[in-house]
Every structure is written in structure tokens, then in C-alpha cells.
Amino acid sequence: MHREDDSTSTGRREERLSTGKGDSLQPGPDQRIFQTALYRPQRHGLILFPQRLYGNCLAPLAYSNYVAPRELHSSIHAEGRTLSVRLIMLFVNTSKRSRTLPPVGSTVMRILVNLCQLLSAEFQLLQGSQRLIFKLCYRTCPDQRRGDTRVAQCPGDSHLSQCLTATFRNGVQRPDAPQQLFVLCTGLQGAALIRPRPFGDSVQIAGGQQSLSQRRKDNAAGSDLAKGIEQAIFDPAIEHVVIGLMNEKRNPLFLQDRGSLLRQFRRIAGNPHIKRLALTVQMRERSHRLFQRRGGVHTVRIEDVDIVEPHPLQRPGRGWRSGICDLPPMPPYGPGHMSQPAFEEMIISSR
């Protein structure tokens, strides 16, 4: 009897929720109704009913074993503004113990609902939530290619790319080629901007600056006006009038010294008198290393090949199998038969 009363009261609450005639759930002029229904006849069915949004108030409402709607309505809080759709979930226990509960009505909000299908839900922005659409769980790092240049970054993070930061042995990195030409033409040292370093600020960089790539860069100072005097001894000798030519061939300075174009316009002030080592033939010397060489691959021609005593298996013919098959059958050997010298002579003559 108590169960029937409970089921009857629950059915009334469900009807009041579905038809919108309840006192505490009457929609106002600014209230929007989201219509969604779902029913799966399983052991623990799930039914989703529409929820009324009171202004900017959002709160998930869940019915477990037919909880009174008035109690759940009291749990609505007006805290936060997010973009989402809140559904009233009704868990129906279809086991043997609760089969006496009333069935779910075939209409929700006076609209015929197919209990075996999931209807479409409406997603709309709430009023006053234009500034905050999604709540950021964490600030994205610049290494994930989706960060913001104005977001505060860690000192070890690079600038908007997945890459390895330069080592900490030098605080600055050489500027780009246009900046070096600017320093060379104007005669100003240290006026060029530097790339974002671990000790620098990623925001205060030039617009044309490139971020650190995915390989570790050389972070030596880019002003080669004073550095080039020390590295002059490793450049081509002074007898080469044209810089970048060696043995009448173009030396790949752009591949070896691509980090600085200032070396292309620099002349040698003196001959270091360093003799190269003649270790191998046709070896080239790099412009920035003294003993770094490269070996070439050449064709080899074979002449006057003499074969001395080839192996029996390497004789010309159909193969080693043919040599065995062409042998005559072995005669009987032993007392009363062919002697050993005659047998060996016959074998040799057959070959």
C-alpha cells in the first residue's frame, strides 16, 4: 500500500514536471526550455527530461529512484556562467523489486516523444556569458602550438613551437642575417635584437624573428666584427682571391656557415702559414675546420686477373653436381678385383 502511494505521488510529480504546471517550476518570460528525452529499457534505464533555466542559473538536476522535484529544485545555485546544457536525469530501476512503479508517459512537454530514440538537444549561449564561454582549466604552454604570445611563460619554454631551448652557457644568441647586415652597414654593435632566450622575455621580440626550431641552435654571439679576427685563420688561404672558392670549385659556405652571412663579406688579413696534411687523395678542406675532410667514391677497373689453381667446385661447367654425375661407376675394389694403382689411374683419366 505504501508502495502504491509512493508510485502515485511520483507519477503526479512526473506529470507536473513534463507538463510544466507545477508551482515551483513555472517558466518565466526570460526562461528557455531545453527539450531532450532518452529512454532505454535496460535493467537500469535512463530518462532525460527537459530542464528550465532560470535566467543565468545553471545546475545539474538528477533524479535517483524518483526523488521529489521540489527537493532538487532547491539545489539550483546561481554561481558561474558556463556554456553547457544541463539535463534532468531520471534513473529508473527496472528490476523485479520496482516493477510496480508507473510507466513513463509518452509525452514530454506536450510533445510526442519516441521512447526508443534520442532527440536532438538545443545548445544556446546564455545571456551575459559572452565574455566567458569556456573555462580554461590551465594555461596552454607555447610548446603545444596553441598558446598565446602574451601569456606568461616559464623561463625554459621556447616561443610558440615544440623545440629544444638553447643551452645555458651563453645568455644570447646570434641575430639573423638582416640584423647582421644592419650592424655591418651602420657600424652599431649590440643594436640588433636577440632571440627569446631562457633568461629573456618572449614578448619583447621583433616581429620578423623566428622562434627556436626543433633542433638545438648554436647560441654564440652574432656580432662577428670582433669574433671574425680570431676565426680568420680557419678561413681559406689568402692566395684565393675570391672568397668562397677553393680549387676552382664553389665551397659550400652557405651550408657550413649558414648562421652568419657576415663571413661572406670578410677578407683575410694575413696568411696563417698552416700546411694541410696529405693523408688521402682528392680530399677537400672545409672553410671553418682545419682537418675536417671528406672522402669520395670512385670507380675501380680490374685488369690482368690471373687465376691460380681454382677450386674444384669453381671449375667452368654445369656446376659441381655435373662433375659428380659424370664420374663412371666405381669398380669393385679389394682382394680378387682391380688393384689400387689401376683404380686411381682410371679415376684420374676420367677427369
Swiss-Prot record:
Keyword list, A-Z: Herbicide resistance
Region of interest (Disordered), residue spans: 1-29
Superkingdom classification of source: Bacteria
Biased composition (Basic and acidic residues): 1-18
One record GO biological process: response to herbicide
Annotated coiled-coil segments of the chain: none
Note: PG2982 is able to utilize glyphosate and other phosphonate compounds as a sole phosphorus source; it can grow in over 100 mM glyphosate.
Protein purpose: Confers an increase in glyphosate resistance when expressed in E.coli.
Protein's name according to its UniProt entry: Increased glyphosate resistance protein
Organism: Pseudomonas sp. (strain PG2982)
Taxonomic path: Bacteria, Pseudomonadati, Pseudomonadota
